[in-house]
Amino acid sequence: MTNPTAAIIVIGDEILSGRTKDKNIGWLAEQLNSQGIQLREARVIPDIRETIIETVKTMSAAHDLVFTSGGIGPTHDDITTECIAAAFGKKVIRHPEAEARLLSHYENTGLEFNAARQKMADIPEDAALIDNPLSAAPGFILENVHVFAGVPSITVSYTHLTLPTME
């Protein structure tokens, strides 16, 4: 039996401009390889809807597993969720469990659970949530695509929760 293959898609204009340094590709590559998952490709792409959709389609067809990093936060340029949904022909829904986790988190921190933060509870239909013990904003898995936040500490958390299920 051959080892599964994987690809990483890092999404964000801030990475391409050099304003933010990517720390997720190298770390995730080490984790995947330690599990016998062969990382075959990594791409850094801009926050452009068509580019995200086409890259996800191409890479999910070519590899057993795809991991995305970035674009699922509360800001206007965080469009990864809607693009992943579009790539698989799914609708984006307000996920009740994700919303409850986020509401509880923001109530406990005393911060307002405003519309921008509520956006982080929007998940493609049929996606499975990935828990986030750091900030409560979940990642998700749709088909063979694992969608992670770009914040390195959250990526580490998501990875520790998802890699054991791939053995």
PLM-predicted stretches and their roles:
Residues 81-115:
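Glycine/small-residue-rich loop that forms an oxyanion/phosphate-binding "nest" at active or ligand-binding sites
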Residues 5-35, 41-42:
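Glycine-rich phosphate/diphosphate-binding loop of Rossmann-like nucleotide-binding domains
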Residues 160-167:
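Single conserved hydrophobic/aromatic residue that forms the stacking wall/gate
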Residues 136-158:
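Conserved anion/nucleotide-ligand pocket segment
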Residues 26-78, 86, 107:
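N-terminal small/polar loop signature for handling phosphorylated ligands or for N-terminal nucleophile
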Residues 13-14, 71-74, 152-154:
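Short glycine-rich anion-binding loops that position phosphate/pyrophosphate groups of nucleotides
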Residues 55-59, 83, 101, 158:
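Alpha-helical scaffold elements adjacent to nucleotide-binding pockets in ATP/GTP-utilizing enzyme cores
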